[in-house]
């Protein structure tokens, strides 16, 4: 598996902190849209690099996609929590 740069990991930590601190559904929706946009962009990059034969870069993008998919799950969990309140 390819490594992910420290800057990206720090961004993911900050992003996940935002999810956990979010106190309303409207703000959570903004976070969700940013996450989905990032996921879409990374997947497009993955497809492009993979089709061009840059498998190391493609693997890196796929690894980053996995982080954003995990964040999607956290967003869903936070939404469930906020809906119950």
Q: Would you name each region that the model predicts?
A:
Residues 1-85:
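C-terminal accessory/regulatory regions appended to core domains
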């Amino acid at each position: 598996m390819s490594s992910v740069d420290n800057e990206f990991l720090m961004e993911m930590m900050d992003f996940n902190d935002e999810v956990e601190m979010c106190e309303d559904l409207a703000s959570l929706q903004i976070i969700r849209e940013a996450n989905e946009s990032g996921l879409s962009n990374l997947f497009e990059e993955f497809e492009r690099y993979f089709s061009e034969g840059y498998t190391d870069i493609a693997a890196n993008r796929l690894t980053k996609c996995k982080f954003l998919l995990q964040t999607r799950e956290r967003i869903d969990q936070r939404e469930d929590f906020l809906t119950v309140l």
